[in-house]
């Protein structure tokens, strides 16, 4: 089973994935971008830009990472439990200047039509995001600010709605303000 965690920065995806690592010791845990050697280099380029990258080039770099990630991680482990911190869904949401149909077609190509069976979407409000962003050193994407993140979160919700029409998937939406223990319990039940 292929499971992905989605949500903007600072909603607790990494915390919940860490808790699952204690339970699912044989699962494959991965992330996008950066789940492969190529992905680590691309992630560094994308998150710590030293010069401007146009939106089309940025999209294609993310797609290159996704295609490599599919080949090295997803394809070779498709009969195991795979839990990913982000996926093509975030890619579609962050590429908000492009149409969903185009983004879906490009991602379908990069993933050879291999999509998650379950999506866990952690949703946060402005206060939660502000509080958590203030506690960390920000990368180039995080420096775009709260309004940017809330617009991406809105786009994530629209992408999830779009995907319900395109692929067979179960989606669990959770309020990131809940305690990590309560969220963990809800996630465990969803994965059974």
UniProtKB/Swiss-Prot annotation:
Gene: tmk
SUPFAM superfamilies: P-loop containing nucleoside triphosphate hydrolases
Record-level GO BP terms: dTDP biosynthetic process; dTTP biosynthetic process; dUDP biosynthetic process
Name of the featured protein: Thymidylate kinase
InterPro entries for this protein: P-loop_NTPase (IPR027417), Thymidylate_kin-like_dom (IPR039430), Thymidylate_kinase (IPR018094)
Record function comment: Phosphorylation of dTMP to form dTDP in both de novo and salvage pathways of dTTP synthesis.
One family name in Pfam for this protein: Thymidylate_kin
GO cellular component: cytosol
Keywords: ATP-binding, Kinase, Nucleotide biosynthesis, Nucleotide-binding, Transferase
Similarity remark: Belongs to the thymidylate kinase family.
Root EC class: transferase
Source organism of this protein record: Campylobacter jejuni subsp. jejuni serotype O:2 (strain ATCC 700819 / NCTC 11168)
Origin: domain of life: Bacteria
Catalytic activity: dTMP + ATP = dTDP + ADP
Entries under PANTHER family matching the protein: THYMIDYLATE KINASE, UMP-CMP KINASE 2, MITOCHONDRIAL
EC number: 2.7.4.9
Gene Ontology MF annotations: ATP binding; dTMP kinase activity
CDD domains, A to Z: TMPK (cd01672)
Residues that coordinate or bind ATP: 7-14
């Amino acid at each position: 089973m292929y499971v992905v965690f989605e949500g903007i920065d600072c909603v607790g995806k990494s915390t919940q994935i860490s808790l699952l690592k204690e339970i699912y010791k044989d699962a494959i845990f991965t992330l996008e971008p950066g789940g492969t050697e190529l992905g680590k280099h691309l992630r560094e380029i994308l998150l710590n830009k030293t010069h401007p990258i146009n939106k089309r080039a940025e999209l294609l770099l993310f797609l290159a990472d996704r295609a490599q990630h599919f080949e090295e991680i997803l394809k070779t482990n498709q009969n195991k439990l795979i839990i990913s911190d982000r996926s093509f869904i975030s890619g579609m949401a962050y590429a908000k200047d492009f149409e969903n149909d185009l983004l879906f077609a490009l991602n379908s190509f990069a993933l050879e039509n291999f999509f998650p069976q379950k999506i866990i979407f952690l949703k946060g409000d402005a206060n939660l995001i502000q509080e958590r962003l203030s506690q960390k050193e920000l990368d180039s994407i995080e420096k775009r600010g709260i309004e940017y993140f809330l617009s991406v979160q809105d786009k994530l919700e629209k992408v999830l709605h779009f995907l319900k029409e395109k692929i067979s998937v179960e989606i669990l939406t959770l309020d990131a303000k809940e305690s990590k223990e309560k969220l963990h319990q809800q996630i465990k039940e969803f994965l059974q």
